[in-house]
């Protein structure tokens, strides 16, 4: 059965508070599966399985699938629809409260697939990356605006701290755009399927990741300000900051959105050296 048929079969009522939008376009489902590149060696962690339409396709291809679902009304539907699969584990929990490192422990070749409510997209991605969860890739359906921020380059309005965070740890690839007509109920915004492939090492080597991300966040907190003014929040004396900018070869009158990840790394290392 397809998504609409399962929803009707169980007379499922959508929970607006959970931001539920279920995918009904089978061509998008096929592109997610193809883009995620799932094989029999992979353990898949799925966040937001809905009524299990995508989950079935994952179960057919993966070694095992762990699906995380918050909505208690979906649990019996998933249990019934997927009862024939012995490689399926259903976790009734808020993904924001999951210990992903514990879940991934002693598992090889972990790939994540998610169709997330838009309000949890950035917190989930940030946690998976900053907590150094051991996964190979994340294939995710997200709001078009967020995907464009993740995939942005310097010197554009979409480029920001989320861009730097994701691209520090991952290569990014947009798989396809998705119309609001591909969902029930129909969302108000366009979506994009994007894949994040985890790098074996961070894109740049820095002396302190904590300082690096502090510099990045401070640089984008007030986008129209120069780096010199933005980085005053670090509470470093004027002479030391002048020295750091000079050693990094970066003009303090530039704005954060003009710096590449490599330049952020160079600047944070020079600040680290003078602390």
Swiss-Prot record:
Give any Pfam family that matches: RrnaAD
Keyword Methyltransferase carried by entry: yes
Enumerate the residues binding S-adenosyl-L-methionine.
Answer: 21, 23, 48, 69, 94, 115
Which Enzyme Commission number(s) are on file for it? 2.1.1.182
Principal place of residence: cytoplasm
Q: Which reaction(s) does the protein catalyse, per the Swiss-Prot or TrEMBL entry?
A: adenosine(1518)/adenosine(1519) in 16S rRNA + 4 S-adenosyl-L-methionine = N(6)-dimethyladenosine(1518)/N(6)-dimethyladenosine(1519) in 16S rRNA + 4 S-adenosyl-L-homocysteine + 4 H(+)
- UniProt-recorded Gene Ontology molecular function terms: 16S rRNA (adenine(1518)-N(6)/adenine(1519)-N(6))-dimethyltransferase activity; RNA binding
Q: Which InterPro entries match?
A: KsgA/Erm, rRNA_Ade_diMease-like_C, rRNA_Ade_Mease_Trfase_CS, rRNA_Ade_methylase_Trfase_N, rRNA_adenine_dimethylase, SAM-dependent_MTases_sf
Which enzyme type, at the first EC level? transferase
Record flagged with keyword Cytoplasm = yes
Question: Where found?
Answer: Cytoplasm
SUPFAM superfamilies, alphabetized: S-adenosyl-L-methionine-dependent methyltransferases
Q: Which UniProt keywords apply?
A: Cytoplasm, Methyltransferase, RNA-binding, rRNA processing, S-adenosyl-L-methionine, Transferase
Q: Where are the transmembrane segments?
A: none
Gene Ontology CC annotations of this record: cytosol
HAMAP family documented for this protein: 16SrRNA_methyltr_A (MF_00607)
UniProt-listed NCBIfam families:
ksgA
Family membership, please give it: Belongs to the class I-like SAM-binding methyltransferase superfamily. rRNA adenine N(6)-methyltransferase family. RsmA subfamily.
Q: What does this protein do?
A: Specifically dimethylates two adjacent adenosines (A1518 and A1519) in the loop of a conserved hairpin near the 3'-end of 16S rRNA in the 30S particle. May play a critical role in biogenesis of 30S subunits.
Q: What is this protein called?
A: Ribosomal RNA small subunit methyltransferase A
Native source species: Clostridium botulinum (strain ATCC 19397 / Type A)
What gene is this protein translated from? rsmA
């Amino acid at each position: 059965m397809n998504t609409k048929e399962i929803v009707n079969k169980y007379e499922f009522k959508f929970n607006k508070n959970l931001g539920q939008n279920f995918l009904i376009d089978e061509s998008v489902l096929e592109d997610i599966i193809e883009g995620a590149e799932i094989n029999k060696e992979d353990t898949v962690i799925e966040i937001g399985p809905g009524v299990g339409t995508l989950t079935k396709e994952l179960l057919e291809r993966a070694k095992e699938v762990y699906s995380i679902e918050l909505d208690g009304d979906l649990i019996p539907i998933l249990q019934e629809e997927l009862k024939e699969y012995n490689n399926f584990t259903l976790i009734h929990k808020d993904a924001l409260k999951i210990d992903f490192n514990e879940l991934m422990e002693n598992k090889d070749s972990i790939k994540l697939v998610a169709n997330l409510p838009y309000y949890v997209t950035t917190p989930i991605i940030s946690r998976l990356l900053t907590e150094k969860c051991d996964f190979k890739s994340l294939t995710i359906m997200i709001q078009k605006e967020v995907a464009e921020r993740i995939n942005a380059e310097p010197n554009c309005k979409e480029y920001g701290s989320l861009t730097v965070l994701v691209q520090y740890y991952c290569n990014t690839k947009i798989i396809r755009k998705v119309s609001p007509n591909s969902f029930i109920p129909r969302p108000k915004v366009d979506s994009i399927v994007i894949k994040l492939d985890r790098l074996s090492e961070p894109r740049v080597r820095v002396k302190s990741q904590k300082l690096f991300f502090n510099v990045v966040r401070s640089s984008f907190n007030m986008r129209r300000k120069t780096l010199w003014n933005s980085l005053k929040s670090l509470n470093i004396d004027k002479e030391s900051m002048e020295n750091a900018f000079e050693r990094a070869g970066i003009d303090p009158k530039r704005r954060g959105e003009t710096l590449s990840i490599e330049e952020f790394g160079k600047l944070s290392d020079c600040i680290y050296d003078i602390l």
